[in-house]
Curated annotation (Swiss-Prot):
Effect of residue 148 to R: In VTI1-1; exhibits defects in TGN to PVC transport at nonpermissive temperature
GO molecular function, one term: SNAP receptor activity
Summary of subunit composition and partner proteins: Forms SNARE complexes with the t-SNAREs VAM3 and VAM7, and the v-SNAREs NYV1 and YKT6 on vacuolar membranes, which are involved in biosynthetic transport pathways to the vacuole and in homotypic vacuole fusion. Forms SNARE complexes with the cis-Golgi t-SNARE SED5 and the v-SNAREs SFT1 and YTK6, which are involved in retrograde traffic to the cis-Golgi compartment. Forms SNARE complexes with the t-SNAREs TLG1 and TLG2, and either the v-SNARE SNC1 or SNC2, which are involved in traffic from early endosomes to the trans-Golgi network (TGN).
Cellular compartments per GO CC: autophagosome membrane; cytosol; endoplasmic reticulum membrane; endosome membrane; ER to Golgi transport vesicle membrane; fungal-type vacuole membrane; Golgi apparatus; Golgi membrane
Residue ranges that the UniProt entry lists as topological domain Vesicular: 216-217
Family the UniProt entry places it in: Belongs to the VTI1 family.
Main location, first listed in the record: membrane
Superkingdom: Eukaryota
Modified residues (Phosphoserine): 110, 149
Protein name (Swiss-Prot/TrEMBL): t-SNARE VTI1
Coiled coil: none
Keywords: Acetylation, Coiled coil, Golgi apparatus, Membrane, Phosphoprotein, Protein transport, Transmembrane, Transmembrane helix, Transport
Residue ranges crossing the lipid bilayer per the database entry: 195-215
């Protein structure tokens, strides 16, 4: 494992624990402090997703063993689920419309003027939009991961096809070599047989001449 990957993992774990602790403290905080805490947690959540992306890139670049790479990618998927369950959902539950009354419950409504109320509602709307953007980003990330996995599978399949084709070419080359050797052997035998045939014909002609010579002598 590369030193950069170890550093990313350490930063991820530290940021994750800090975000959990902030979410645990937020419900008991005054409204102004709570809003600040939630914004900070939102930033930490973005950092966590960024770290996962950076770790995924580093895994592809630094881990050559396919089995080890697959194991680490499974760990990244588990961490992504942890962010969803331990950070994103609790954060959303504190900022969505269903929890608005609880978020403002510790304030006396009669003491809040219109400007303050409008500011609170504006902050809530901003958090709501941020939550929607996070949902879209998560959906796009999942789709991208699926496309990337499919591309890797296609590349792996093409590599296997090329390997099989190369083996087939090696076998065909071996067969061609054997065929050439067989043809050379057959050619040598044909030449030898031709010389033998010429020799036999010459001997027969010689015998015929000897017979004729003996008769006319």
């Amino acid at each position: 494992m590369s030193s950069l990957l170890i550093s990313y993992e350490s930063d991820f774990k530290t940021t994750l624990e800090q975000a959990k602790a902030s979410l645990a403290e937020a419900p008991s905080q005054p409204l102004s402090q709570r809003n600040t805490t939630l914004k900070h947690v939102e930033q930490q959540q973005d950092e966590l997703f960024d770290l996962l992306d950076q770790m995924d890139v580093e895994v592809n670049n630094s881990i050559g063993d396919a089995s080890e790479r697959a194991t680490y990618k499974a760990k990244l998927r588990e961490w992504k689920k942890t962010i969803q369950s331990d950070i994103k959902r609790p954060l959303q539950s504190l900022v969505d419309s269903g929890d608005r009354d609880r978020l403002f419950g510790d304030l006396n409504a009669s003491n809040i003027d219109d400007d303050q109320r409008q500011q609170l509602l504006s902050n809530h709307a901003i958090l709501q939009k941020s939550g929607d953007r996070l949902k879209d980003a998560s959906r796009i990330a999942n789709e991208t991961e699926g496309i990337g996995s499919q591309i890797m599978m296609d590349l792996r399949s093409q590599r296997e096809t090329l390997e099989n084709a190369r083996q087939t070419l090696f076998q065909a080359d071996s067969y061609v070599d054997k065929s050439i050797k067989t043809l050379k052997t057959m050619t040598r035998r044909l030449v030898a047989n031709k010389f033998i045939s010429y020799a036999i014909i010459a001997v027969l002609i010689l015998l015929i001449l000897l017979v004729l010579f003996s008769k006319f002598k």
